[in-house]
């Protein structure tokens, strides 16, 4: 049997022409680019190295310069002249039995002695800062070394400088994990993963506490002068505590150089209302809409304090960052936003009642 023919179907529109998909031009990579390829992270952009970091490096890691040598030489000549003149005055006063002048010479000698002692103490502090930079370079070399015998002594010296007792659980775990067949790289890596996080955790807590206090203080303070003074005090105190935590004592000269950084931080805090403009990248739209102007400025000051603490932590730390263990600004950012949100909710609850 023959099947009946199907009726004809007429289409109103024109036939669709097959379009060839358009591809981008081929892009080739050489072997060097392929080996150094790193995927971009969308969660957090890397911290921009700006003026704050440069000043921080100059403050905690002082460098020698020609002008500094000239000033030190002039001060040395002036000090020698003062001492020589003082000796001559003392001899003349003793020969002429001028007891008043002799008492003045004795008082001047005490003042000069105190000044020399302060200079020596300051020099020791600067020397400790330079030694910490050398220790960090030495640790970086040991982390790439396959030799033996230097890693254990180096780590024990770091533990002694940090004030970690031999009976500390973290140090005991490190002693139990190392043996004679391990090279310096493995010994230092174990120290960085078992002992160093104890100090890093304390530094993180100090940074979180200072950043939170700066955020909440500026969020509730109505006076800009109080905000500036509070930020200056908290930033200097944070740097001193982090340096002391890692076994570094800052002298007067280092604090004067750090004061320049604090002034920059205060200037940034005065312009922290820019946080409201870019707040959509940092927090959800709902929370940004509920934040007041003072709260946004407080978050900006808190983030800058946290950034200052991270840089101080990096420069005072005896070991370089390994395995991406460097604290990120985003971690402190989330804590600050959560604390501000909790504070705002607590402020609304009593008013609603």
Curated annotation (Swiss-Prot):
Predominant subcellular localization, coarse grouping: membrane
Localization in the cell: Cell inner membrane
Membrane spanning stretches: 70-90, 100-120, 213-233
Membrane topology annotation: Multi-pass membrane protein
Family: Belongs to the UPF0283 family.
Origin superkingdom: Bacteria
Keywords: Cell inner membrane, Cell membrane, Membrane, Transmembrane, Transmembrane helix
Organism for this UniProt entry: Shigella sonnei (strain Ss046)
InterPro entries noted in UniProt: DUF697, UPF0283
Any one of the GO CC terms: plasma membrane
PANTHER family: UPF0283 MEMBRANE PROTEIN YCJF
Alphabetical list of HAMAP family matching this protein: UPF0283
Annotated protein name in UniProt: UPF0283 membrane protein YcjF
């Amino acid at each position: 049997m023959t099947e009946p023919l199907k009726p004809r179907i007429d289409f109103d529109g024109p036939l669709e022409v097959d379009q060839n998909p358009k591809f981008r031009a081929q892009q080739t990579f050489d072997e060097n680019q392929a080996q150094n390829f790193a995927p971009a992270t969308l969660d957090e952009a890397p911290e921009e190295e700006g003026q704050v970091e440069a000043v921080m490096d100059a403050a905690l890691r002082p460098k020698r310069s020609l002008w500094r040598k000239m000033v030190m030489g002039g001060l040395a000549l002036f000090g020698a002249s003062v001492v020589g003149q003082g000796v001559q005055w003392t001899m003349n006063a003793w020969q002429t039995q001028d007891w008043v002048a002799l008492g003045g010479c004795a008082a001047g000698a005490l003042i000069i002695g105190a000044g020399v002692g302060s200079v020596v103490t300051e020099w020791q502090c600067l020397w400790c800062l330079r030694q910490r930079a050398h220790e960090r370079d030495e640790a970086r070399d040991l982390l790439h070394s396959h030799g033996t015998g230097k890693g254990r002594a180096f780590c024990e010296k770091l533990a002694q400088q940090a004030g970690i007792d031999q009976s500390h659980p973290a140090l005991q775990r490190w002693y139990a994990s190392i043996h004679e067949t391990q090279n310096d790289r493995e010994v230092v890596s174990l120290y960085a993963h078992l002992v160093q996080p104890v100090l890093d955790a304390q530094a993180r807590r100090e940074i979180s506490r200072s950043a939170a206090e700066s955020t909440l203080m500026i969020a509730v303070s109505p006076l800009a002068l109080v905000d500036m003074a509070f930020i200056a005090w908290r930033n200097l105190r944070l740097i001193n505590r982090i340096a002391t935590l890692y076994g570094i004592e800052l002298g007067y000269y280092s604090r004067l150089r750090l004061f320049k950084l604090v002034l920059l931080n205060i200037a940034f805090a005065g312009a922290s209302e820019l946080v409201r403009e870019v707040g959509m990248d940092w927090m959800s739209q709902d929370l940004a809409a509920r934040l007041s102007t003072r709260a946004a400025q407080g978050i900006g000051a808190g983030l800058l304090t946290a950034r200052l603490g991270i840089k101080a932590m990096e420069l005072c730390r005896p070991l370089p960052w390994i395995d991406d263990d460097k604290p990120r600004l985003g971690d402190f950012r989330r804590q600050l936003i959560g604390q501000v949100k909790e504070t705002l909710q607590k402020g609304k609850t009593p008013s609603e009642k």
